[in-house]
Amino acid sequence: MVKTVIFGHKNPDTDTICSSIAYADLKTKLGHEVAPVRLGEVNLETQFALDKFNIHAPELIERVEDGAEVILVDHNEFQQSVDNIENATIREVIDHHRISNFETKEPLYFRAEPVGCTATILNKMYKENDISVDKNIAGILLSAIISDSLLLKSPTCTEEDVQAAHELAEIAGVDLESYGLDMLKAGADLSDKTVKDLITMDAKEFAMGNAKVEIAQVNAVDTNEIYKLHDKLVEVITSRINDNDLDLFLFVVTDILNNDSEVLAIGNGKDKVNAAFNVTLDSTNRALLKGVVSRKKQIVTVLTEQFK
């Protein structure tokens, strides 16, 4: 690998894939030799967006060469990145998450903004560099914003995200509401997923105090369909906890129509889950989290406080 590679986090979501592609497009137009890559399989929601705007998914990688120059988008925490990230040379980070478990040997360009989506930052960066966004890139940037903001309904969604979404929808030539709902529904089709798929397709590991916590989130139209698999979910999650030396695993199923989530908590620290969300996990270790849709803003932040 000679070029600088651009990638997002493991278990990639739509923002991670689309922002990697879009930032590679911008950097290339600015004269840099870069290539987008990915650290996992493309989910149905993301594939829907890529197909809509005639864009191929980036190459899949598992490692980068030692010393390779890399740019991180949509993440910065090393446990969410490529396995040997400590041996890479990180040149840039473009992100919208908390900054944690991150260090470099050399100075770098680090841009983190409190917006709902990395794509919103990239849309600004096109403007700052006087580079026009073409129709297909506008489409995938829009798709990323729709995904991260649950069609502009998430509490992480800012006015900047809203403005960017409307602007990009016009460039892409799509109706924001109808396209957005179609895309989210495509992602919520979990009929062909195994239980292992469900708990890994959008899972992120977090350091909370001295605890290792993994939080997996899936979007669904009918949460009850997912939890018909309760016993198997518990079995597979317990195995994952043991294999990865985790303290706690949260499996969050978000109802994209009602904007609520149901959580299944397995491992140590279930009392902290109760305290964080002012709920009581039932005998099956589940609870309804009313109005909770954002892992970043409504789950990670409040749960981290309980582990301090």
From Swiss-Prot:
<feature type="binding site">
    <location>
        <position position="96"/>
    </location>
    <ligand>
        <name>Mn(2+) 2</name>
    </ligand>
</feature>
<feature type="binding site">
    <location>
        <position position="74"/>
    </location>
    <ligand>
        <name>Mn(2+) 2</name>
    </ligand>
</feature>
<keyword id="KW-0479">Metal-binding</keyword>
<feature type="binding site">
    <location>
        <position position="9"/>
    </location>
    <ligand>
        <name>Mn(2+) 1</name>
    </ligand>
</feature>
<dbReference type="Pfam" id="PF02833">
    <property type="entry name" value="DHHA2"/>
</dbReference>
<feature type="binding site">
    <location>
        <position position="15"/>
    </location>
    <ligand>
        <name>Mn(2+) 2</name>
    </ligand>
</feature>
<dbReference type="GO" id="GO:0004427">
    <property type="term" value="F:inorganic diphosphate phosphatase activity"/>
</dbReference>
<dbReference type="Pfam" id="PF01368">
    <property type="entry name" value="DHH"/>
</dbReference>
<dbReference type="InterPro" id="IPR038222">
    <property type="entry name" value="DHHA2_dom_sf"/>
</dbReference>
<dbReference type="GO" id="GO:0030145">
    <property type="term" value="F:manganese ion binding"/>
</dbReference>
<dbReference type="GO" id="GO:0005737">
    <property type="term" value="C:cytoplasm"/>
</dbReference>
<dbReference type="InterPro" id="IPR001667">
    <property type="entry name" value="DDH_dom"/>
</dbReference>
<keyword id="KW-0378">Hydrolase</keyword>
<comment type="similarity">
    <text>Belongs to the PPase class C family.</text>
</comment>
<dbReference type="InterPro" id="IPR004097">
    <property type="entry name" value="DHHA2"/>
</dbReference>
<feature type="binding site">
    <location>
        <position position="13"/>
    </location>
    <ligand>
        <name>Mn(2+) 1</name>
    </ligand>
</feature>
<keyword id="KW-0963">Cytoplasm</keyword>
<feature type="binding site">
    <location>
        <position position="74"/>
    </location>
    <ligand>
        <name>Mn(2+) 1</name>
    </ligand>
</feature>
<feature type="binding site">
    <location>
        <position position="148"/>
    </location>
    <ligand>
        <name>Mn(2+) 2</name>
    </ligand>
</feature>
<keyword id="KW-0464">Manganese</keyword>
<dbReference type="InterPro" id="IPR022934">
    <property type="entry name" value="Mn-dep_inorganic_PyrPase"/>
</dbReference>
<dbReference type="InterPro" id="IPR038763">
    <property type="entry name" value="DHH_sf"/>
</dbReference>
<protein>
    <recommendedName>
        <fullName>Probable manganese-dependent inorganic pyrophosphatase</fullName>
        <ecNumber>3.6.1.1</ecNumber>
    </recommendedName>
</protein>
